[in-house]
Design a protein with these regions (language model features):
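Enzyme catalytic cores with a strong preference for nitrogen-chemistry domains
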Residues: 1-370, 386-395, 427
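ATP/NTP-dependent adenylation/nucleotidyl-transfer catalytic domains that generate, transfer
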Residues: 16, 32, 171, 228-230, ...
Length: 682
């Protein structure tokens, strides 16, 4: 991959789509053709691959019996020829609504046009005939039209509901069209098309507006995109349609796998477009992982096996078009306050319920936990406290130790004691430094002779002793050791293996990424899970630098200065674990999410001082670190990880669950992909 096209969305598995609405002139196909071409030219300049227009946009949806007038139908065909001719030098595939004569009926059609030719024509399957709708008076039912052709512009073109349109030069871009009512039936044509391979489902809609119908449309579009693991592009008729008995709002929107990517203002006065970049890689990956999707295709192969595919070349631009979709800086932490609060409520209670069930299943032992005053052990402790509350047990059944070492600060130790005291757990302090000195002396470590050697052995002696003490204390007191290590540390292998923080009897934090941890604790404070004193202590802990506190010195020993920003590592982890994306694509996404601290939304209450930006060289640097540690180093630690609940839809790293990988693999394929492009400049 060269620096020239690294910035192109089409090099990273995206395709730009647009749902277009504008002013319709009823019964004036030539005027409407010019509106379509005006939109098409704008979409061409915007790098759009697929532009979708409303139902019967060339004449207006609301013209009733005028649909049976030859003069009008003649003009529709002539206007369509104008659109075809005008598209010759333009990029987008145009999906245009028009009434067309075929055999003995008039059909309500989606005409697929690209670069001066008609690729195919799809008739509406289910013209409605209830309430305000009376389409069957004029329009034929196209549901059984399969394998046919239609004469259009002097040529024979494919005609039927069994048509897919595939871009040969954009992997994964496979288009299917359905019309308005088609998506309201129990088994819509788009469902079969998705099983047959369509990834971009489009709906040309008339759909007069009534109170509440907008939300119904959104529900159906969201559901279709989620069930079909597809993009769903919807364009409804708007201004200019007849208001004899109805009104129109011109709603346009783009969904992808259940997520709203773009929508227009309703009741627009002029041209309006909902434009978004749909992620074809994401859709492909989700379908591959969800094996039942293809199982369902096989069940329905009698219907899905005979779809016809019309191939075309899009010839997408290699230029930098930006990225037209919202990206979360923190994929595990939504910026929307309501969604974040809901996620935190669910995550916390998943952890609490997981621990409560485990304790009940093994006879109700006490819980032994080491409390450092840092985020992870703090959160594990408040999970344990709530689990005891739910089980009707005293919090004194939690046996909490703070185990200070050579570099433990007074600040973190004081916070640990305050938290244990305010929660009412059984608290104690056990200083590990005498035992650590003895062990280092017996090992003939230079530190024992007074030399300031703070190597990995020095660090792991402390980490190992803490865990060793906790396990022996659990033996002595009839308890289990509660693990505190989080999902991000598991990904990077940032733990001491065996007799160290990698091991416990049960780990409530193993499914929680580091970037979510602080928000969980903030939610615990704001939702009043504990008293005010506990809340104040939790707030003080949130302000503490992330550090293992293993090396003596004047400055706080920051984990992130060594291993990299957890913000970037969690961004990478989400896209590797959930979607299997290439490192080069993750770099592209991370740059768009992180290069400008002032752009986009931050999670609520995120500290201003920590709202930083990252340039591409820094993103690549830490991506390489992640790839080396995740793929080539850390799996042996994950292969032996304790039980713990999955928390996020982003995935878990349990070898019994979401991530099953060999412990002796390597990172070469991922590092080669990351090296495919020279260092581009934005």
């Amino acid at each position: 991959m060269s620096a020239t096209n690294f910035w192109s969305i089409y090099q990273h598995g995206f395709a730009r789509v647009a749902a277009c609405t504008g002013h319709t002139v009823i019964a004036d196909p030539r005027a409407n053709a010019e509106t379509v071409l005006r939109h098409a030219r704008r979409c061409d300049g915007d790098g759009v691959a697929v532009a979708v227009f409303p139902e019967m946009v060339l004449c207006g949806y609301s013209i009733e019996d005028l649909l049976l007038q030859d003069a009008l139908l003649d003009e529709v065909e002539e206007a369509l020829e104008d659109v075809v001719a005008g598209s010759a030098g333009l990029l987008p595939v145009l999906v245009v609504g028009a009434p067309l004569r075929h055999r003995n009926r008039v059909y309500n059609c989606a005409v697929i046009v690209h670069r001066g030719r008609v690729l195919g024509v799809v008739p509406k399957s289910y013209p409605p005939n209830y309430r305000e709708f009376y389409e069957r008076r004029q329009i034929g039912d196209g549901a059984d039209e399969r394998g046919g052709s239609i004469r259009l512009g002097g040529a024979s073109v494919p005609f039927g509901v069994d048509l897919l349109f595939a871009a040969e030069d954009v992997p994964g871009l496979v288009l299917h069209a359905e019309i308005c009512e088609d998506m309201w039936v129990p088994v819509p044509p788009s469902a079969e098309a998705a099983l047959a391979g369509a990834t971009v489902l489009v709906n040309l809609s008339g759909s007069p507006i009534t109170v509440g119908r907008s939300e119904d449309r959104k529900l159906l579009c969201r559901s279709a995109s989620s069930r079909c693991i597809a993009a769903y592009v919807y364009a409804a008729a708007g201004l200019g349609e007849s208001t004899t008995d109805l009104s129109w709002d011109g709603q346009a929107m783009v969904y992808e796998n259940g997520l709203l990517l773009a929508e227009t203002e309703r009741f627009p006065l002029g041209d309006s477009q909902a434009v978004a970049d749909v992620d074809l890689d994401l859709l492909r990956q989700e379908r591959q992982r969800m094996g039942t999707f293809d199982d369902n295709r096989r069940t329905h192969r009698a219907r899905t096996g005979d779809f016809r595919t019309v191939a075309f070349e899009l010839d997408p631009p290699a230029a930098d078009l930006g990225l037209r979709r919202r990206l979360e800086r923190f994929p595990f932490v939504p910026a929307d306050p309501g969604r974040l609060a809901q996620d935190c409520y669910e995550a916390y209670n998943i952890q609490v319920a997981g621990l409560q069930q485990r304790l009940a299943a093994i006879g109700g032992p006490k819980v032994v936990i080491g409390v450092s005053g840092g985020l992870d052990s703090t959160h594990a402790l408040i999970v344990a406290a709530r689990a005891m509350d739910r089980a009707g047990r005293p919090r004194s059944d939690i046996l909490a130790w703070t185990l200070p070492g050579f570099a433990t600060s007074d600040h973190t130790k004081d916070n640990a004691h305050k938290l244990m005291r305010s929660l009412g757990v059984t608290a104690a302090e056990l200083d590990i430094t005498p035992t650590a000195r003895l062990m280092l002396k017996e090992m003939d470590h230079p530190f024992a002779a007074g030399e300031p050697v703070y190597d990995v052995t020095f660090e792991n002696v402390q980490a190992g002793l803490r865990t060793d003490y906790l396990f022996r204390l659990a033996n002595q007191r009839g308890g289990i050791v509660l693990g505190t290590g989080d999902l991000s540390e598991l990904a990077l292998g940032w733990s001491t293996y065996g007799v160290g923080d990698q091991m416990s009897h049960y780990n409530v934090n193993s499914g929680v990424p580091k970037t979510l941890m602080q928000h969980l604790i903030r939610w615990v404070i704001s939702s009043g899970q504990f008293d005010e004193e506990t809340g104040r202590t939790l707030a003080a802990i949130l302000d503490t630098e992330i550090s293992p506190e293993l090396v003596p010195g004047e400055e706080m020993q920051s984990t992130e200065s060594k291993i990299g920003p957890y913000a970037l590592h969690d961004f990478t982890l989400f896209h590797v674990l959930r979607f299997g994306f290439r490192p080069s694509k993750i770099a592209f996404l991370a740059w768009h999410a992180w290069h400008d601290a002032d752009a986009g939304d931050w999670p609520p209450n995120f500290p201003e001082a920590k709202r930083v930006a990252y340039d591409l060289p820094e993103i690549r640097r830490w991506l390489e670190v992640f790839c080396r540690r995740f793929f080539a180093f850390a799996q042996f630690k994950r292969s032996a990880m304790p039980n713990g609940p999955k928390v996020s839809a982003g995935g878990s790293l349990s070898p019994r669950g979401d991530w099953r990988a060999p412990s002796d693999s390597n990172a070469r394929a991922w590092l080669r992909d990351l090296a495919r492009f020279d260092e581009p400049t934005a």
